Amino acid sequence: MELPEVLQDEQYYEGIGRRKRSSARVRIYPAVQGQPLFMVNDKDVREFFPRFGDYEILVGPLEDTDLLGRVAVTVLVEGGGITGQRDSVRLGIARALVKYDENLRGALRENGHLTRDPRVKERKKPGLKRARKAPTYTKR
C-alpha cells in the first residue's frame, strides 16, 4: 500500500484487529489538511464498505473518543467476508487509539470497542456432513 507523501514520514500508531478469518492492520496519523481521512486498502472507506450502516460501525471508536476528523486512518485488511473485515477494522482502530492515548481506554471499553469477538467457524467432525449436521437417519 502506497501512502500519500505527506503521511509517509509521519509518526503513526498501529493496531491489529481480527475477526473470524479476517485480519486488519490499522494505522492512525495526525490529520493533514487536504489528505483523505479514512482509507481501506487504498480505497475510500465508503467505497470499500458500501453497505448501509457499515460506516457508522467503523467510525464508532472515533466518534466515542471525539477524534473523528482529527486523525487520519489507513487500513490494510485481508481474509474473511465483509462483516468480518468490518469488525476487524473497528477493533484495530480501537487498539490503535489506545496506543495513541491511554486515557481513551475507558471510553472504548465501555462501548465494547476493545472486546475481540471470539466466535470462529467450528470444524467439521468425522461422520457428519458439516460441524453439527448429521446425515439423514434411515431406520431400514
Task: List the predicted regions and their residue ranges.
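Structured, basic alpha/beta domains of bacterial-type, RNA-associated proteins
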Residues: 2-20, 24, 28-29, 34-78, ...
